[in-house]
């Protein structure tokens, strides 16, 4: 009997000392258009994507106060933050431009593209209370044989700016959360980066 009680006590201690269950998150993206004929549609490659060093980790990072961040050890990205950003922006571009020919740099070895979209994320402020603010520098870089096709300037307020073979721009987007918790926060991040893709689309259409 004493042996049984000892075994039960040890089992309870082990259960109490076990690590919490890890939860995994991913950003949601718009469905990519399906078309029976994709030939002749613009082809885009999104990436590489760079993010601040403090964000480039498997754990979710959340702003807990003005100068303090919290790293959630047991709440992690199912893939990677950079991969999710590329996927969401890719899906946004595909939907808005009406082309299925959009892929991320990290997911494909294909170099047969018309334009490459480089994303340099300067900051992601994620707060459970106030939502998300993302600051992204981006570059639309034509393939070598498409240089003459893209000669627009990224500043929409400039009428006399010189023509350029590459467009560079910046998106500062804020998105409120729809509810409490990390699920709502990741959903807000998804919407914010989809809006970044929308701003890139607007410039490509000009």
Task: Identify the residue ranges that each predicted region occupies.
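Generic beta-structure capping elements
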Residues: 47-49, 60-65, 139, 143, ...
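Short secondary-structure boundary motifs at beta->alpha junctions and helix caps
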Residues: 68-78, 145-199
């Amino acid at each position: 009997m004493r042996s049984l009680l000892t075994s039960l006590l040890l089992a309870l201690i082990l259960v109490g000392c076990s690590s919490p269950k890890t939860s995994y998150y991913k950003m949601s993206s718009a469905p990519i258009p399906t078309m029976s004929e994709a030939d002749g549609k613009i082809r885009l490659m999104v990436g590489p994507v760079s993010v601040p060093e403090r964000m480039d980790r498997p754990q979710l990072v959340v702003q807990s106060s003005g100068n303090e961040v919290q790293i959630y050890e047991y709440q992690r990205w199912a893939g990677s933050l950079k991969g999710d950003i590329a996927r969401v922006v890719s899906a946004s571009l595909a939907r808005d431009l009406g082309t299925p020919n959009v892929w991320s740099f990290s997911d494909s070895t294909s170099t047969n593209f018309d334009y490459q979209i480089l994303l340099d994320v300067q900051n992601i402020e994620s707060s459970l209370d106030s939502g998300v603010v993302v600051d992204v520098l981006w570059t639309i870089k034509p393939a070598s044989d498409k240089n003459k096709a893209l000669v627009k300037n990224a500043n929409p307020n400039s009428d006399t700016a010189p023509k350029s073979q590459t467009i560079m721009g910046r998106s500062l987007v804020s998105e409120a959360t729809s509810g409490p918790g990390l699920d709502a926060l990741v959903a807000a991040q998804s919407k914010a980066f989809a809006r970044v893709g929308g701003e890139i689309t607007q410039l490509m259409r000009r």
